[in-house]
Protein backbone atom coordinates (compact mmCIF):
# COMPACT_ATOMS: atom_id res chain seq x y z
CA UNK A 1 0.00 0.00 0.00
CA UNK A 2 1.36 3.43 -1.00
CA UNK A 3 2.25 5.71 1.91
CA UNK A 4 -0.02 8.73 1.91
CA UNK A 5 1.03 12.34 2.27
CA UNK A 6 0.76 13.59 5.86
CA UNK A 7 1.75 16.52 8.06
CA UNK A 8 2.66 16.23 11.74
CA UNK A 9 3.03 19.22 14.04
CA UNK A 10 5.89 18.58 16.47
CA UNK A 11 5.89 21.83 18.39
CA UNK A 12 4.86 25.46 18.45
CA UNK A 13 6.28 28.69 19.88
CA UNK A 14 3.81 31.53 19.52
CA UNK A 15 2.55 31.19 15.96
CA UNK A 16 5.83 29.61 14.74
CA UNK A 17 5.37 25.89 14.02
CA UNK A 18 7.77 22.95 14.01
CA UNK A 19 6.65 20.02 11.91
CA UNK A 20 7.31 17.18 9.52
CA UNK A 21 5.76 16.36 6.16
CA UNK A 22 5.85 12.67 5.27
CA UNK A 23 5.84 11.56 1.64
CA UNK A 24 6.71 8.27 -0.08
CA UNK A 25 9.93 9.93 -1.25
CA UNK A 26 11.04 11.06 2.17
CA UNK A 27 10.53 13.42 5.06
CA UNK A 28 10.42 17.21 4.80
CA UNK A 29 11.37 19.07 7.97
CA UNK A 30 9.39 22.26 8.50
CA UNK A 31 9.84 25.19 8.40
CA UNK A 32 11.34 24.26 5.02
CA UNK A 33 12.99 26.21 2.22
CA UNK A 34 12.75 24.79 -1.31
CA UNK A 35 15.50 25.69 -3.80
CA UNK A 36 14.06 26.50 -7.22
CA UNK A 37 14.95 24.14 -10.06
CA UNK A 38 13.12 26.05 -12.79
CA UNK A 39 14.06 23.92 -15.80
CA UNK A 40 14.78 20.66 -13.92
CA UNK A 41 17.99 22.09 -12.52
CA UNK A 42 19.00 24.43 -9.73
CA UNK A 43 21.31 26.65 -11.76
CA UNK A 44 25.04 26.02 -11.19
CA UNK A 45 24.32 23.08 -8.84
CA UNK A 46 24.34 19.30 -9.19
CA UNK A 47 21.32 17.63 -7.54
CA UNK A 48 23.68 15.85 -5.15
CA UNK A 49 25.11 19.23 -4.14
CA UNK A 50 21.64 20.65 -3.52
CA UNK A 51 20.96 17.76 -1.17
CA UNK A 52 24.27 18.37 0.62
CA UNK A 53 23.16 21.92 1.45
CA UNK A 54 20.42 20.35 3.58
CA UNK A 55 17.45 20.67 1.22
CA UNK A 56 14.72 18.05 1.71
CA UNK A 57 12.64 19.17 -1.29
CA UNK A 58 13.00 21.35 -4.36
CA UNK A 59 10.62 23.15 -6.71
CA UNK A 60 10.10 22.59 -10.43
CA UNK A 61 8.35 24.97 -12.80
CA UNK A 62 5.39 23.72 -14.81
CA UNK A 63 5.44 26.57 -17.33
CA UNK A 64 9.08 26.12 -18.31
CA UNK A 65 8.98 22.31 -18.31
CA UNK A 66 5.81 22.13 -20.42
CA UNK A 67 7.53 24.22 -23.09
CA UNK A 68 10.96 22.58 -22.93
CA UNK A 69 11.57 19.65 -22.95
CA UNK A 70 7.73 19.09 -22.54
CA UNK A 71 5.97 17.15 -19.83
CA UNK A 72 5.22 14.32 -22.24
CA UNK A 73 8.92 13.79 -22.96
CA UNK A 74 9.78 13.83 -19.26
CA UNK A 75 7.02 11.27 -18.63
CA UNK A 76 8.42 8.97 -21.34
CA UNK A 77 11.82 9.23 -19.65
CA UNK A 78 10.46 8.10 -16.29
CA UNK A 79 9.25 11.32 -14.65
CA UNK A 80 10.95 14.42 -13.32
CA UNK A 81 12.79 12.71 -10.43
CA UNK A 82 14.54 10.23 -12.71
CA UNK A 83 15.04 12.83 -15.45
CA UNK A 84 17.00 15.19 -13.18
CA UNK A 85 18.46 12.59 -10.78
CA UNK A 86 16.69 13.86 -7.65
CA UNK A 87 15.18 11.12 -5.49
CA UNK A 88 13.67 13.41 -2.85
CA UNK A 89 10.26 15.16 -2.93
CA UNK A 90 9.48 17.72 -5.64
CA UNK A 91 6.82 20.43 -5.56
CA UNK A 92 5.73 21.90 -8.88
CA UNK A 93 3.97 25.21 -9.27
CA UNK A 94 0.92 25.35 -11.54
CA UNK A 95 2.40 27.60 -14.23
CA UNK A 96 -0.14 30.30 -13.48
CA UNK A 97 2.25 32.91 -12.11
CA UNK A 98 4.58 32.74 -15.13
CA UNK A 99 1.71 32.80 -17.62
CA UNK A 100 0.10 35.79 -15.92
CA UNK A 101 3.43 37.61 -16.21
CA UNK A 102 3.37 37.36 -20.01
CA UNK A 103 1.75 40.76 -20.53
CA UNK A 104 0.68 41.14 -24.15
CA UNK A 105 1.30 37.47 -24.92
CA UNK A 106 -1.73 35.96 -23.16
CA UNK A 107 -5.53 35.92 -23.16
CA UNK A 108 -7.43 35.16 -19.95
CA UNK A 109 -10.88 33.51 -20.01
CA UNK A 110 -13.00 31.44 -17.63
CA UNK A 111 -11.61 28.32 -19.27
CA UNK A 112 -7.96 29.21 -18.70
CA UNK A 113 -5.14 31.16 -20.30
CA UNK A 114 -4.03 31.08 -23.92
CA UNK A 115 -0.49 32.32 -24.37
CA UNK A 116 2.49 32.41 -26.71
CA UNK A 117 5.73 30.71 -25.75
CA UNK A 118 8.55 33.09 -24.88
CA UNK A 119 10.88 30.59 -26.60
CA UNK A 120 9.46 30.28 -30.11
CA UNK A 121 6.11 32.08 -30.15
CA UNK A 122 4.09 28.86 -30.36
CA UNK A 123 0.54 28.98 -28.96
CA UNK A 124 -0.42 27.05 -25.82
CA UNK A 125 -3.34 26.72 -23.41
CA UNK A 126 -3.15 26.31 -19.64
CA UNK A 127 -6.28 25.50 -17.67
CA UNK A 128 -6.84 23.83 -14.31
CA UNK A 129 -7.27 20.50 -16.10
CA UNK A 130 -4.18 20.89 -18.29
CA UNK A 131 -2.05 22.06 -15.34
CA UNK A 132 -3.07 18.95 -13.36
CA UNK A 133 -2.31 16.75 -16.38
CA UNK A 134 1.17 18.25 -16.77
CA UNK A 135 2.03 17.95 -13.09
CA UNK A 136 0.88 14.32 -13.10
CA UNK A 137 3.06 13.62 -16.12
CA UNK A 138 5.97 15.10 -14.18
CA UNK A 139 4.98 12.87 -11.22
CA UNK A 140 5.24 15.74 -8.76
CA UNK A 141 4.94 14.88 -5.08
CA UNK A 142 3.18 18.16 -4.27
CA UNK A 143 0.98 19.66 -6.97
CA UNK A 144 -0.26 23.25 -6.89
CA UNK A 145 -3.75 24.13 -8.08
CA UNK A 146 -4.06 26.54 -11.02
CA UNK A 147 -4.68 30.15 -10.04
CA UNK A 148 -4.40 33.74 -11.18
CA UNK A 149 -2.05 36.09 -9.37
CA UNK A 150 -2.51 39.81 -10.16
CA UNK A 151 0.34 42.22 -9.48
CA UNK A 152 -0.05 44.69 -6.63
CA UNK A 153 -1.19 47.38 -6.21
CA UNK A 154 -4.49 46.67 -7.98
CA UNK A 155 -8.06 47.98 -7.58
CA UNK A 156 -10.26 46.05 -5.14
CA UNK A 157 -12.63 45.11 -7.98
CA UNK A 158 -9.76 43.50 -9.90
CA UNK A 159 -8.56 41.62 -6.79
CA UNK A 160 -12.11 40.39 -6.10
CA UNK A 161 -12.68 39.12 -9.64
CA UNK A 162 -9.29 37.42 -9.67
CA UNK A 163 -9.84 35.73 -6.29
CA UNK A 164 -13.28 34.44 -7.30
CA UNK A 165 -11.89 33.09 -10.58
CA UNK A 166 -9.03 31.39 -8.72
CA UNK A 167 -11.53 29.71 -6.37
CA UNK A 168 -13.50 28.33 -9.33
CA UNK A 169 -10.24 27.12 -10.81
CA UNK A 170 -9.31 25.57 -7.43
CA UNK A 171 -12.49 23.46 -7.52
CA UNK A 172 -11.72 22.34 -11.08
CA UNK A 173 -8.12 21.55 -10.09
CA UNK A 174 -9.37 19.39 -7.19
CA UNK A 175 -11.71 17.46 -9.49
CA UNK A 176 -9.04 16.95 -12.15
CA UNK A 177 -6.46 15.85 -9.57
CA UNK A 178 -8.78 13.17 -8.18
CA UNK A 179 -7.35 10.61 -5.76
CA UNK A 180 -3.63 10.09 -6.36
CA UNK A 181 -2.21 8.11 -3.41
CA UNK A 182 1.14 9.34 -2.15
CA UNK A 183 0.79 12.72 -3.84
CA UNK A 184 -0.67 15.97 -2.51
CA UNK A 185 -2.63 18.88 -3.94
CA UNK A 186 -2.30 22.33 -2.36
CA UNK A 187 -4.89 25.09 -2.65
CA UNK A 188 -3.82 28.72 -2.96
CA UNK A 189 -5.40 31.53 -0.96
CA UNK A 190 -5.80 34.80 -2.84
CA UNK A 191 -7.29 38.20 -2.01
CA UNK A 192 -4.43 40.66 -2.24
CA UNK A 193 -4.14 42.90 0.82
CA UNK A 194 -7.87 42.71 1.62
CA UNK A 195 -8.60 40.78 4.83
CA UNK A 196 -12.23 40.06 3.99
CA UNK A 197 -11.31 38.70 0.55
CA UNK A 198 -8.61 36.53 2.12
CA UNK A 199 -11.26 35.18 4.48
CA UNK A 200 -13.66 34.36 1.65
CA UNK A 201 -10.86 32.65 -0.27
CA UNK A 202 -9.86 30.57 2.76
CA UNK A 203 -13.48 29.56 3.34
CA UNK A 204 -13.83 28.40 -0.27
CA UNK A 205 -10.59 26.42 -0.12
CA UNK A 206 -11.52 24.74 3.16
CA UNK A 207 -14.82 23.65 1.63
CA UNK A 208 -13.01 22.06 -1.34
CA UNK A 209 -10.44 20.39 0.99
CA UNK A 210 -6.76 20.25 0.09
CA UNK A 211 -3.71 18.46 1.47
CA UNK A 212 -1.97 21.78 2.15
CA UNK A 213 -2.57 25.47 1.62
CA UNK A 214 -0.50 28.27 0.15
CA UNK A 215 -0.74 31.97 0.84
CA UNK A 216 -0.51 33.33 -2.69
CA UNK A 217 -0.57 36.78 -4.22
CA UNK A 218 2.22 38.23 -2.07
CA UNK A 219 5.80 39.26 -2.88
CA UNK A 220 4.38 40.85 -6.04
CA UNK A 221 5.26 44.47 -5.34
CA UNK A 222 3.54 45.24 -2.03
CA UNK A 223 6.69 45.43 0.15
CA UNK A 224 7.62 43.64 3.37
CA UNK A 225 5.50 45.74 5.74
CA UNK A 226 2.32 45.10 3.74
CA UNK A 227 3.21 41.42 3.31
CA UNK A 228 3.69 40.97 7.06
CA UNK A 229 0.42 42.81 7.60
CA UNK A 230 -1.38 40.12 5.59
CA UNK A 231 0.57 37.33 7.29
CA UNK A 232 -0.58 38.62 10.67
CA UNK A 233 -4.00 37.12 9.87
CA UNK A 234 -3.93 35.03 6.67
CA UNK A 235 -2.24 31.83 7.95
CA UNK A 236 -4.71 31.65 10.84
CA UNK A 237 -7.56 31.45 8.32
CA UNK A 238 -6.18 28.15 7.01
CA UNK A 239 -6.49 24.69 8.64
CA UNK A 240 -4.06 24.20 11.53
CA UNK A 241 -3.46 20.54 10.71
CA UNK A 242 -2.17 21.18 7.17
CA UNK A 243 1.11 22.74 5.97
CA UNK A 244 1.10 26.42 5.02
CA UNK A 245 3.26 27.59 2.12
CA UNK A 246 4.25 31.19 1.30
CA UNK A 247 5.00 31.24 -2.41
CA UNK A 248 7.99 33.07 -3.91
CA UNK A 249 9.50 34.35 -0.62
CA UNK A 250 12.11 35.55 -0.02
CA UNK A 251 14.96 37.37 1.72
CA UNK A 252 16.27 35.93 5.01
CA UNK A 253 14.38 38.54 7.04
CA UNK A 254 11.20 37.67 5.15
CA UNK A 255 11.58 34.01 6.10
CA UNK A 256 12.12 34.73 9.79
CA UNK A 257 9.16 37.12 9.89
CA UNK A 258 6.90 34.69 8.04
CA UNK A 259 7.81 31.70 10.24
CA UNK A 260 7.03 33.91 13.23
CA UNK A 261 3.55 34.34 11.73
CA UNK A 262 2.86 30.64 11.12
CA UNK A 263 4.29 29.75 7.69
CA UNK A 264 5.83 26.28 7.16
CA UNK A 265 7.19 26.27 3.59
CA UNK A 266 8.98 28.69 1.26
CA UNK A 267 10.56 28.85 -2.18
CA UNK A 268 12.53 31.59 -3.90
CA UNK A 269 15.08 32.02 -6.70
CA UNK A 270 16.90 34.67 -4.66
CA UNK A 271 19.74 32.60 -3.13
CA UNK A 272 20.67 30.95 -6.44
CA UNK A 273 20.15 34.05 -8.61
CA UNK A 274 22.07 36.22 -6.16
CA UNK A 275 24.95 33.76 -6.12
CA UNK A 276 25.33 34.15 -9.87
CA UNK A 277 25.46 37.95 -9.54
CA UNK A 278 27.96 38.08 -6.67
CA UNK A 279 25.45 38.75 -3.88
CA UNK A 280 26.26 36.57 -0.87
CA UNK A 281 24.05 36.06 2.20
CA UNK A 282 25.77 35.77 5.57
CA UNK A 283 24.83 35.98 9.25
CA UNK A 284 25.95 39.63 9.11
CA UNK A 285 23.95 40.61 6.05
CA UNK A 286 24.67 40.71 2.33
CA UNK A 287 28.23 40.72 0.99
CA UNK A 288 28.92 42.02 -2.52
CA UNK A 289 31.88 39.87 -3.51
CA UNK A 290 32.50 41.94 -6.64
CA UNK A 291 33.54 44.96 -4.54
CA UNK A 292 37.25 45.85 -4.61
CA UNK A 293 37.49 45.70 -0.80
CA UNK A 294 37.65 41.88 -1.06
CA UNK A 295 40.53 41.71 -3.57
CA UNK A 296 43.24 41.18 -0.92
CA UNK A 297 41.13 39.61 1.83
CA UNK A 298 42.42 36.15 2.89
CA UNK A 299 39.42 35.47 5.16
CA UNK A 300 36.40 33.30 4.29
CA UNK A 301 32.99 34.77 3.57
CA UNK A 302 31.82 33.57 6.98
CA UNK A 303 34.23 31.99 9.45
CA UNK A 304 31.45 29.88 11.00
CA UNK A 305 30.09 28.53 7.70
CA UNK A 306 30.94 24.95 6.66
CA UNK A 307 30.04 25.18 2.96
CA UNK A 308 32.79 24.46 0.38
CA UNK A 309 33.17 28.15 -0.50
CA UNK A 310 33.91 29.07 3.11
CA UNK A 311 35.91 25.96 4.01
CA UNK A 312 38.35 26.14 1.13
CA UNK A 313 38.43 29.59 -0.47
CA UNK A 314 39.21 33.15 0.54
CA UNK A 315 37.20 36.25 -0.23
CA UNK A 316 40.10 37.32 -2.45
CA UNK A 317 39.79 34.17 -4.55
CA UNK A 318 36.01 34.37 -4.77
CA UNK A 319 36.33 38.02 -5.80
CA UNK A 320 38.84 37.03 -8.48
CA UNK A 321 36.81 34.21 -10.06
CA UNK A 322 33.68 36.37 -10.05
CA UNK A 323 35.42 39.31 -11.73
CA UNK A 324 37.03 36.90 -14.22
CA UNK A 325 33.61 35.51 -15.17
CA UNK A 326 34.56 31.97 -14.19
CA UNK A 327 31.76 29.38 -13.90
CA UNK A 328 33.24 28.24 -10.59
CA UNK A 329 32.12 31.54 -9.07
CA UNK A 330 28.44 30.76 -9.70
CA UNK A 331 28.90 27.24 -8.36
CA UNK A 332 30.58 28.25 -5.11
CA UNK A 333 28.47 31.31 -4.34
CA UNK A 334 25.21 29.53 -5.12
CA UNK A 335 26.25 26.61 -2.89
CA UNK A 336 27.07 29.05 -0.10
CA UNK A 337 23.75 30.90 -0.38
CA UNK A 338 21.69 27.71 -0.42
CA UNK A 339 23.70 26.36 2.53
CA UNK A 340 23.07 29.61 4.42
CA UNK A 341 19.33 29.40 3.77
CA UNK A 342 19.17 25.79 4.96
CA UNK A 343 21.19 26.65 8.08
CA UNK A 344 18.76 29.51 8.72
CA UNK A 345 15.83 27.09 8.51
CA UNK A 346 17.56 24.64 10.85
CA UNK A 347 18.22 27.44 13.30
CA UNK A 348 14.53 28.34 13.28
CA UNK A 349 13.50 24.70 13.73
CA UNK A 350 15.85 24.36 16.70
CA UNK A 351 14.59 27.61 18.23
CA UNK A 352 10.93 26.61 17.93
CA UNK A 353 11.69 23.24 19.48
CA UNK A 354 13.47 24.95 22.37
CA UNK A 355 10.73 27.54 22.86
CA UNK A 356 13.18 30.34 22.03
CA UNK A 357 11.99 31.71 18.70
CA UNK A 358 11.75 35.28 20.04
CA UNK A 359 15.37 35.04 21.17
CA UNK A 360 16.41 33.62 17.81
CA UNK A 361 14.69 36.46 15.96
CA UNK A 362 16.33 39.09 18.18
CA UNK A 363 19.79 37.59 17.65
CA UNK A 364 19.19 37.28 13.90
CA UNK A 365 18.14 40.92 13.54
CA UNK A 366 21.03 42.15 15.71
CA UNK A 367 23.62 40.25 13.65
CA UNK A 368 22.12 41.41 10.37
CA UNK A 369 22.24 45.02 11.61
CA UNK A 370 25.96 44.75 12.43
CA UNK A 371 26.89 44.52 8.76
CA UNK A 372 29.89 42.83 7.18
CA UNK A 373 33.25 42.50 8.92
CA UNK A 374 35.66 45.41 8.48
CA UNK A 375 38.01 45.21 5.50
CA UNK A 376 41.62 44.10 6.05
Swiss-Prot record:
EC number: 2.4.2.29
Entry's family note: Belongs to the queuine tRNA-ribosyltransferase family.
Region RNA binding, annotated ranges: 248-254
Enzyme type, top EC level: transferase
Recorded name of the encoding gene: tgt
Listed Gene3D superfamilies: Queuine tRNA-ribosyltransferase-like
Protein name: Queuine tRNA-ribosyltransferase
UniProt catalytic activity: 7-aminomethyl-7-carbaguanine + guanosine(34) in tRNA = 7-aminomethyl-7-carbaguanosine(34) in tRNA + guanine
Signal sequence, start to end: none
Stored InterPro entries: ArchSynthase1/Queuine_TRR, TGT, TGT-like_sf, tRNA_ribo_trans-like
Residue numbers binding Zn(2+): 305, 307, 310, 336
SUPFAM superfamilies named in the record: tRNA-guanine transglycosylase
Chain ranges passing through the membrane: none
UniProt GO MF annotations: metal ion binding; tRNA-guanosine(34) queuine transglycosylase activity
Subunit structure: Homodimer. Within each dimer, one monomer is responsible for RNA recognition and catalysis, while the other monomer binds to the replacement base PreQ1.
Organism: Dinoroseobacter shibae (strain DSM 16493 / NCIMB 14021 / DFL 12)
Residues the record marks as active site: 93, 267
GO cellular component entries: cytosol
Amino acid sequence: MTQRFSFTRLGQDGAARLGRINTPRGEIRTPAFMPVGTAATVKAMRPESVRETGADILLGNTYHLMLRPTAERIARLGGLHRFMNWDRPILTDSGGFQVMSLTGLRKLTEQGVTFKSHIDGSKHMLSPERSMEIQKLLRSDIVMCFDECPALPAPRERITESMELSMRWAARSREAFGDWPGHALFGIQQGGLEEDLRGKSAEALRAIEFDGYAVGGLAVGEGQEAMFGVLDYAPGMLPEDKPRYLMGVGKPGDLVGAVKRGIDMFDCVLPSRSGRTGQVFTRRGVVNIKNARHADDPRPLDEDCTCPACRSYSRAYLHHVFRAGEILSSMLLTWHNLHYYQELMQGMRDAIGAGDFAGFEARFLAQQAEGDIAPV
